[in-house]
Amino acid sequence: MGRLDGKVIVLSAAAQGIGKASAIAFAKEGAQVTATDINGEKLKELDGIPGIKTKVVDVTKKDQVDALAKDFDHVDVLFNIAGFVHHGSILDCEESDWDFTMNVNVRSMYLMIKAFLPKMLARKSGNIINMASVASSIKGVVNRCVYSTSKAAVIGLTKSVAADFLEQGIRCNCICPGTVDTPSLRERIQARPDPEQAFKDFMARQRTGRLCTAEEVAHLCVYLASDESTFVTGTEVIIDGGWRL
């Protein structure tokens, strides 16, 4: 018996990093997983894994999100992960940077929740997990202005949905990681003028002396997706190795 036997789970940004690790972990625990991403080539790496179906979806496009939702009679767990990290202070953030980041990090979750929530309400049962960050309303982080703002908005969205639909059988929580060793992080490091120094800077703020792994976050995701966490809602679940302390 798996911890997620029979649960229907839809997640975004599943082609790599936390999304990919979570999709695999969900399937291993018996869930029926639909893994979506905008990157069709990377998403193919999940093809053939028992319990996982893949679908290319741009979660910033309402028509694509609505079409995805129509494919399901019901969904037990919706996991919103899609996000973008902008580097810089408010002075480095152009209006286009602001709009792009808020569109990917916040509006996509709004679209996904709005599309799938009615199906959950019809069954008086549903579980929504949103990816936020310690870099948010939890902790001020240098050169993460619009990113932190967007993730603070995700925390607010999470609490609002949890409060509005608590009595109707809906749970909504968000995960707030610190620095996670993912392909996205490695790409951002390599894009910096001095990648070696950038990596040292990331490591210097890790009080545990190492980065979090995507698999460690996925273990937490399994717990939040399972019935083991039925009394948990409206919560920012932090997994940061003590970075915020």
Curated annotation (Swiss-Prot):
Gene encoding it? bdh2
Keyword annotations of the record = Cytoplasm, Lipid metabolism, NAD, Oxidoreductase
- Which residues of the sequence carry a binding annotation for NAD(+)? Q16, G17, I18, D37, D58, K151, V180, D181, T182, P183, S184
Pfam families reported for this sequence:
adh_short_C2
InterPro entries in UniProt? NAD(P)-bd_dom_sf, Sc_DH/Rdtase_CS, SDR_fam, SDR_superfamily_enzyme
Family that this chain belongs to: Belongs to the short-chain dehydrogenases/reductases (SDR) family.
- Molecular-function GO term, any one: oxidoreductase activity, acting on the CH-CH group of donors, NAD or NADP as acceptor
Query: Which reaction does this enzyme catalyse, per its entry?
Result: cis-4-hydroxy-L-proline + NAD(+) = 4-oxo-L-proline + NADH + H(+); (R)-3-hydroxybutanoate + NAD(+) = acetoacetate + NADH + H(+)
Q: What is its EC number?
A: 1.1.1.-, 1.1.1.30, 1.1.1.104
Q: Domain of life, per the record? A: Eukaryota
Q: What happens when the gene is disrupted?
A: Morpholino knockdown of the protein causes no gross defects in embryos, with the exception of hypochromic blood due to decreased hemoglobin levels.
Looking up PANTHER family in the UniProt record yields:
DEHYDROGENASE_REDUCTASE SDR FAMILY MEMBER 6, DIHYDROANTICAPSIN 7-DEHYDROGENASE
What is the protein named? Dehydrogenase/reductase SDR family member 6
Cellular location(s): Cytoplasm
What the protein does comes down to: NAD(H)-dependent dehydrogenase/reductase with a preference for cyclic substrates. Catalyzes stereoselective conversion of 4-oxo-L-proline to cis-4-hydroxy-L-proline, likely a detoxification mechanism for ketoprolines. Mediates the formation of 2,5-dihydroxybenzoate (2,5-DHBA), a siderophore that chelates free cytoplasmic iron, thereby regulating iron transport and homeostasis while protecting cells against free radical-induced oxidative stress.
- Pathway entry: Amino-acid metabolism; Siderophore biosynthesis
Question: What GO biological process terms are annotated to this protein in UniProt?
Answer: erythrocyte maturation; heme metabolic process; hemoglobin biosynthetic process; lipid metabolic process; siderophore biosynthetic process
The UniProt subunit note reads as follows:
Homotetramer.
Q: Which residues form a coiled coil?
A: none
- The UniProt entry annotates the active site at Y147 (proton acceptor)
Chain residues that bind substrate: R144, R188, R205
Q: Name one GO cellular component term.
A: cytoplasm
